[in-house]
UniProtKB/Swiss-Prot annotation:
S-S bonds: none
GO cellular component, one term: cytosol
Classification via InterPro entries: Ribosome_maturation_RimP, RimP_C, RimP_C_sf, RimP_N, RimP_N_sf
UniProt protein name: Ribosome maturation factor RimP
Length: 181
């Protein structure tokens, strides 16, 4: 069994020590491929470099190894650690995500049906208190309690691509030239 509160309490300080914001901690894969997935980002760029991923992975791994040696491992099975950025079609996990990405298309699934529906697709309007608003393709606004949301993620669109500026394109032209030989 996995203690998510304990995992979050262990992982969040490691991310924060690097100046990173934790986006999601998840455990999936079942018995065949148990995986601890950690998504983080730099708050100023909303991105994560490969070096950031490697450094955070080492910090988390070292911390979990030390807890295991002390008999306090929050995960009682062998697992694979995966550290990554949230990606362009990122999950929306924190209230601030719904404000930050207002105006972009999203898919939201609720834990239980609300007004006969469990899934909502449309444009994020934002969040007010603990109520997320999404406008469907007909322009109907749906008010969803943040606590009722099971999963939410951005939908890859041209608008989202344009809004997501890469950290650096340095070296891209050299890669293209190398591939042309």
């Amino acid at each position: 069994m996995v203690d998510f509160d304990a995992l979050h309490a262990i992982i969040a300080p490691e991310a924060e020590a690097m100046g990173l914001a934790l986006v999601r901690v998840a455990f999936f894969g079942g018995d065949s491929d148990p995986t601890l997935q950690v998504m983080a980002e730099r708050p100023d760029t909303r991105q994560l470099t490969i070096d950031d991923c490697a450094d955070l992975s080492r910090r988390i791994s070292d911390r979990l190894d030390a807890l295991e040696e002390a008999g306090q491992d929050p995960i009682d099975v062998a697992y694979r650690l995966e550290v990554s950025s949230p990606g362009i079609d990122r999950p929306l996990t924190r209230p601030a995500d719904f404000a930050d990405w207002a105006g972009h298309e999203a898919k939201i699934a609720l834990k239980e049906k609300l007004d006969g529906r469990q899934r909502f697709n449309g444009t994020l309007v934002g969040i007010d208190g603990d109520v997320v608003t999404i406008s469907d393709k007909e322009g109907v606004e749906h008010k969803l309690p943040f606590g009722a949301i099971d999963t939410a993620k951005l939908v890859l669109t041209d608008k989202l691509i344009a809004a997501t500026v890469p950290l650096s394109a340095e070296g891209a032209d050299e890669m293209e030239e190398e591939g042309q030989d």
